[in-house]
Amino acid sequence: MVMSQGTYTFLTCFAGFWLIWGLIVLLCCFCSFLRRRLKRRQEERLREQNLRALELEPLELEGSLAGSPPGLAPPQPPPHRSRLEAPAHAHSHPHVHVHPLLHHGPAQPHAHAHPHPHHHALPHPPPTHLSVPPRPWSYPRQAESDMSKPPCYEEAVLMAEPPPPYSEVLTDTRGLYRKIVTPFLSRRDSAEKQEQPPPSYKPLFLDRGYTSALHLPSAPRPAPPCPALCLQADRGRRVFPSWTDSELSSREPLEHGAWRLPVSIPLFGRTTAV
């Protein structure tokens, strides 16, 4: 069977295309293999350097605790010790300076003529730039979290007295979580709160009718002007008292007036909680 010129050309182009494509794929695979090998070598070098640094850190720490660290100048002696040594040397070798007019005896040799063999000058303090850098474990502890901010989820989980869940705050119908004096209660406050009997949440003056709480004026009085009315409302307490524990314990008898109601109306609201 004899192939025509067109068929031969087509097969040649087809085979050449796939050969070139295969060479390109092989070249890409070889390049990726080289890159991975170089990256592995770099990781091994970094791992060796980290291991050496970890091995040298205990030696440097021991040197700083025992004496001078390797490669650095000896540590500076404490100042109070040098101050104590100076008076001792002064007492052992007093420098007597007698005025020539008051001196009557024979001339005494100078005190510096025969210095003590063990008396040496104090070593100079090393420069500050050669001091040992602080270690990560020697850094001061971070300041405590700000108590005025709500805790994050991790802190709330680890707390001994975690805040109430968000579902409980949403389903609260008495407004207990609307007024928070402090963000976190201490153990003492919680113990005192447990010792106190729970307040009875019942409306006030329900045993009597509403007519007994309403005092109608015997004679009609003119209505106060608007500014006086606003000032009176501002000076007074809240129109609707809340159902918080702190206010129930110190609740006073309900004041009767035009702006007071005989029954406390709870206010619903949402607060941020975990």
Curated annotation (Swiss-Prot):
Keywords: Adaptive immunity, Cell membrane, Cell projection, Cytoplasm, Immunity, Lipoprotein, Membrane, Nucleus, Palmitate, Phosphoprotein, Postsynaptic cell membrane, Signal-anchor, Synapse, Transmembrane, Transmembrane helix. It is a single-pass type III membrane protein. Residues 1-44 are annotated as: Required for interaction with NMDA receptors. Residues 1-9 are extracellular. One of its GO terms (biological process) is adaptive immune response. Residues 31-274 are cytoplasmic. This is Proline-rich protein 7.
